[in-house]
Amino acid sequence: MNYTGKKILVLGMGKTGISMVKWLSRLGAQLSVADTRTSPPNLELISRIVPGEAIFCGPLKEELFQGIDAIAISPGVAVAEPLVQAALQQGVPVIGDIELFAVALDQYAPPGTKILAITGSNGKTTVTSMVGEMVKNAGWDVEVAGNIGPAALDALMQRMDANKWPHLWALELSSFQLETTSSLRPDAATVLNLSEDHLDRYDSIEEYAAAKARIFSRPHNNGCVQILNRDDARVYAMADKNSKQVTFGLSAPVSDEEFGLLPGGSDVWLAQGSTHLLKTSELAVAGLHNAANALAALALCRAVDLPFEPLLHALRTFRGLPHRMQKVAEFNGVTFYDDSKSTNIGSAVAALNGFRKNVILIAGGDGKGQDFSPLEQPVSKHVRSVVLLGRDADKVAQAIQASNVPIHRVTTMDEAVQVSFLLAEHGDVVLLSPACASLDMFNNYIHRAEVFTAAVRLIERKFVLTAQTCH
């Protein structure tokens, strides 16, 4: 679509919404912008681009959708919104920022520009960051963008203005972004895993999986290499007979192209086929789930023919991301980890399975309609006690009851940390891995992590002070 003079309704004024406003205004579109919040972010910035009479805050109204040529929808706004559905039925296109980005790349990017696209319930930000570091270490100019930030269109405009195109785009994509994307042509793409998530937005996990699988729906040709997790049946079922597949998993590779784990000496190695590549003990990030992340990142980078040596060097030095299995403190023989980014079951299960020690688990929050029963087995295997807080604490407790692990209820994060420290024995881990969203008690998962860390630091100071007094 040529957007010059076209009437486009942009829904949402968050980071993605403002990026679409800026991009579409460059293309000469006639914009109106709406957000269901009465005081949305970026209102002042948008009012500099869009006339005040074309900006609407509060519940969406039918008249907003009259006479428009397209809807540019932010990931935070559901396509299932009745007024959006009514517009779709009338033939109005509904697009998102990644669709606009994909069309722009086709038009403006130099030939040979590569795209690696990453999605999944858990680990997608980590893998996207890994890929960025690995590609950079291999000597290519890389732009990491999408759900990870910056917004893809913001990164695109910055690159265009500087006339400095990257060799490769590493894109983290959410299911919400993929729903409205049909023109993206990645050279390789992965769905890392699937676990129950966002079931407040999807009717079933099958519908959620179908949204994720759109990452492989490359138009015009089947040149996208599918990087598939063979340990996840729903992901493995996404294999397309017209595309090339490379699998990764925690089992030994069966073919020369597959990535997996192999024993070697007293260690376990990342491997491709029968070739030992890197000891898992050399990874700076802990846990088997991070070994799987590293294997996926290797498979993606090798799909665009980058050499192994700089990729492996980057993996040795990659230190992980904030609030994802991040060590906060260690005192009195107890280690505290912040995994506040764990907003669903799958990420909490992965975190627990990554530990060989006894864990005091802090969990709970807004469960987003998830079935918590998959927590029962890892809790039974790895957890000494569970400390629960938040709106859906009772649902979590019910799901893990059969594990016979003691459950303690608290009302604040401070109390959760205090109780956990009292329960912990020498050599134990206190792990904040909530398996839930944070908005029932906190501004976001970062705020939840900050409150957790502050509570840990307070106990640490008291402990150190007491120890000094005793001496």
Curated annotation (Swiss-Prot):
What is the first-listed, main subcellular location in coarse terms? cytoplasm
Question: Enzyme group, top EC level?
Answer: ligase
Question: Any one cellular component term from GO for this entry?
Answer: cytoplasm
One of the Pfam families matching this protein, by short name: Mur_ligase_C
Reaction catalysed by this chain? UDP-N-acetyl-alpha-D-muramoyl-L-alanine + D-glutamate + ATP = UDP-N-acetyl-alpha-D-muramoyl-L-alanyl-D-glutamate + ADP + phosphate + H(+)
Q: Answer yes or no on keyword ATP-binding.
A: yes
Where would you find this protein in the cell?
Answer: Cytoplasm
Name its pathway.
Cell wall biogenesis; peptidoglycan biosynthesis
Coiled-coil annotated residue ranges, if any:
none
Q: MF terms per GO, please?
A: ATP binding; UDP-N-acetylmuramoylalanine-D-glutamate ligase activity
Q: Which GO terms describe its biological process?
A: cell division; cell wall organization; peptidoglycan biosynthetic process; regulation of cell shape
Enzyme Commission numbers on file: 6.3.2.9
> Quick check: keyword ATP-binding in the entry?
yes
Q: Which UniProt keywords apply?
A: ATP-binding, Cell cycle, Cell division, Cell shape, Cell wall biogenesis/degradation, Cytoplasm, Ligase, Nucleotide-binding, Peptidoglycan synthesis
Binding residue positions for ATP = 120-126
Q: Which domain of life is it from?
A: Bacteria
PANTHER family in the cross-refs = UDP-N-ACETYLMURAMOYLALANINE--D-GLUTAMATE LIGASE
The family line of this record is: Belongs to the MurCDEF family.
State its role: Cell wall formation. Catalyzes the addition of glutamate to the nucleotide precursor UDP-N-acetylmuramoyl-L-alanine (UMA).
Q: What is this protein called?
A: UDP-N-acetylmuramoylalanine--D-glutamate ligase
Which species does this protein come from? Nitrosomonas europaea (strain ATCC 19718 / CIP 103999 / KCTC 2705 / NBRC 14298)
